[in-house]
Amino acid sequence: MLRGGFMEGDAVLVAGSAGSGKTTLALQYLVNGIVKFGEPGIYLTFEQMPDQIYRDAKNFGWDLRKMEEENKFRLICTSPDLLLESQGENLLDEVIKELHPRRIAIDSLSHLEMFVAKGDLRKEAYRLVSFLKTKGMSSLLIWEAGQMSGNSFSVTEVGLSFLVDCIVALKPVEIESAVRKALVILKMRGSDHDKQLRQFEITPAGIKIESAFSNYEGVMTGSPRRVGSEKFMEMFRGASEKRK
């Protein structure tokens, strides 16, 4: 979908509602960097306990504790106010010197809203992204989007879309009485990308991208409908009217 993946140094915003697969995608992004490219990574979280993250990752076959022992991975559990007070520098500098990370995932930027005024959130996020870029790190930033409808969701309301290079939207959707997961690339700065809305599954090995929702429209609005059947009914109604 990304024609080769995220570009080095990119800031990627992953937006989605609870249970849409954001954390799994973030962990898989870090693990792939470590295993496939030898790029150490940091997972910084404001909401989950370490044991839960280690356990969830192990379910996919990702041994984060072993990666930490090999100095390839760090898990940082902290609070948003500590990150804001240090502007990211004091909190991360020591780890950066020890690990020389190339990737970081932050779960999630949404928690900063509780500690800063709405008008200041964009400024603080910009400061954090700029700091990570100066360290030569690619960042994946999670955002709890709540109710998403089309391309309009709460990320744009606080003005974060302009400061990131890529936006990935995830959403669970109900189609024919079954819940499916949808993924779309809304923005990719400086590179071509797949613009189709695609299904994905969370498998025992992580996230697997499936085929596009080619027979449906309105998936991201929450009101999906089968395109083929609608066109057939229109043609059928048209033919019936002509016979009259």
Residue ranges with predicted function:
Residues 9, 37-40, 71-73, 136-137, ...:
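Short glycine-/polar-rich loops that comprise or flank the Walker A/P-loop
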Residues 1-64:
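Walker A/P-loop NTP-binding active-site region of P-loop NTPases
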Residues 84-167, 175-179:
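P-loop NTPase motor core
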Residues 37-123:
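Conserved inter-motif catalytic segment of the P-loop NTP-binding fold
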Residues 12, 42-44, 74-76, 140, ...:
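Hydrophobic/aromatic beta-strand patches that form the interior of the parallel beta-sheet core
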Residues 3, 16-18, 25, 141, ...:
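Scaffold/interface architecture of coatomer-like assemblies
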Residues 97-100, 166, 171-242:
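Conserved P-loop NTPase
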Residues 47-51, 59, 79-84, 110-112, ...:
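Conserved nucleotide-binding/hydrolysis micro-motifs of P-loop NTPases
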